[in-house]
Structures are given as C-alpha cells and as structure tokens.
Amino acid sequence: MHAHLLPGIDDGSPDLDTSIELIRSLQELGFSKLITTPHVMGDMYPNSPSIIRERLTSVQQALIRQEISQELDAAAEYFLDEVMERRIRDNEPLLTLPGKRVLCEFSMLTPTMGVKEMIFEMQMQGYQVIIAHPERYVYLGSNKGFYEELKDMGCLFQLNLLALTPHYGKTVSAL
C-alpha cells in the first residue's frame, strides 16, 4: 500500500501519535500489512534509506509499546528529477516494495526531462518501476500514448482510489 505513515519526514503524518492513529484506522479497515512509502524528493524531502528505516523502527517500537500487532515495512516514493537521475547513475540502492519494485512519481505540472531514460536505467539495474498516481499528471491530459509507452516499457501503475470514481473528472475516468 502506498501511504505516508512515517512521522515528520514528508507531507504525511506530522508526528508519532498521528502515525499510530492512522495505522489503527487502516487496521480497522482490514489492512493486515502496510508498506509506508515516504517521499524522496531533492531538497524538499531529502530522505535517505537510513532516515526512513530509523523512522520505521520508531513507529514499530511505538506499536509494540501500545500492544498493537501490525506488520509494517517501508519503501519510498522517488521523485524523478536531477537528484534521482544522479542516484540512478551512481547506482545507489533504492528502498523498494517486494520484488525490487520501485515507486516513482514525476512533476504533476510540467513534463520531466529524461523520465523514460531514468526508467530504463532503473530497469537495467533490475528494478520494476511503478508509476504512482498517473491520473495526476494534468499536462498529459488525455494523452494515452505516453502511458502506453510506459506500459510497453514494462512499467506498472498505481492509482489513487478516487481515480476510479468521477472525483477527478471525465478525462481521468477515460484514461
């Protein structure tokens, strides 16, 4: 599950108490395993694997203290930009979902240069790329061709649940 549950490292949970509250709510909905995916985005969210693992451990310890049984793991949601391009070029290890699946996103407002090249390089390093919330890339409009190219490259897609409803409008529903 793509979620921002680790406290204070991105636009998700602001603190440990909120993280625990969110996890309890997800448990009540029937989720038995959670994989939190904090943003890794240049200077805005400069999260490293060690920072993410440290926060994961703090949440796991809080769950144990409160006697909440919940399987919780962490990966990351990587923003495809020049910082990520360097990480890929330098072959830095990425935090992945099971099966070396790496969750990626790019700018929602303007096209990102070199997206396909970065995806290809990650694939050459053995990663399976998942594109997060493709319905949000408004500049693509109804350009199904770009999505088809990514699909043909072997990318998977992770939608927001609301993308399956009329919430985002007819263009998104048509995609």
Model-derived regions: residue spans:
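Active-site metal-binding loops of divalent metal-dependent hydrolases
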Residues: 3, 39-40, 77-78, 134, ...
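Metallo-beta-lactamase
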Residues: 4-13, 144-151, 159-162
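Histidine/acidic-residue-rich catalytic or RNA/ligand-binding cores of hydrolases
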Residues: 141-148, 167-175
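Extended substrate/RNA-proximal surfaces in nucleic-acid metabolism proteins
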Residues: 46-158
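Short, solvent-exposed loop/turn segments at secondary-structure junctions
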Residues: 7, 42-44, 138-141, 165-168
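Short, acidic/polar
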Residues: 16-23, 84-88, 113-115, 172-175
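Active-site mouth loops of central-metabolism enzymes
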Residues: 5-16, 103-110, 164
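An N-terminally biased module of ancient metal coordination in phosphate/nucleic-acid-related enzymes
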Residues: 1-68
